[in-house]
Swiss-Prot record:
It comes from Nitrosospira multiformis (strain ATCC 25196 / NCIMB 11849 / C 71). The keyword Endoplasmic reticulum does not apply. It holds the Pfam family GCV_H. This is Glycine cleavage system H protein. Belongs to the GcvH family. The glycine cleavage system is composed of four proteins: P, T, L and H. Keywords: Lipoyl. Residues 23-104 form the Lipoyl-binding domain. One of its GO terms (biological process) is glycine decarboxylation via glycine cleavage system. Its cofactor is (R)-lipoate.
């Protein structure tokens, strides 16, 4: 499985990409979508919602299970991916392109607490055992 090097990751399988405009784009990882299977529903947080790192903020539902998505960093939701309401399967097609929501980070230092691609790879290897 390919793990993009330009993203940060959480132990609960969310990814974060810091954009040029200072916002952070968030989604679930390829590993998470493989575990869940075919997506049938996605609930994203409301624009304007204030999130703290670790807050439950979205839900992804598949034919197998529903899973909470946690805010990887603290900030204000600035956008939610409108395509996922009618086409949740986009997450299965490309988990790193089918973002869930965007935040304006309250503190970019939160990103330093997240895993890089090598750290995330080690996490996946430890979960396989």
């Amino acid at each position: 499985m390919s793990i993009p090097n330009d993203l940060k990751y959480t132990k609960s399988h969310e990814w974060v990409r810091l954009e040029d405009d200072g916002t952070a784009t968030i989604g679930i990882t390829q590993h998470a979508q493989e575990l869940l299977g075919d997506m049938v529903f996605v609930e994203t947080p409301a624009v304007g919602r204030q999130l703290k790192q670790g807050d439950e903020c979205a839900v992804v539902e598949s034919v197998k299970a529903a899973a909470d998505v946690y805010a990887p960093i603290t900030g204000e939701v600035t956008a939610a991916n409108p395509e996922l309401a009618s086409a949740p399967e986009k997450i299965n097609q490309d988990a790193y392109a089918a973002w869930l929501f965007r935040l304006k980070p309250a503190n970019t230092a939160d990103l330093e607490k997240l895993l890089d691609s090598a750290g995330y790879q080690k996490l996946l290897e430890s979960e396989d055992h």
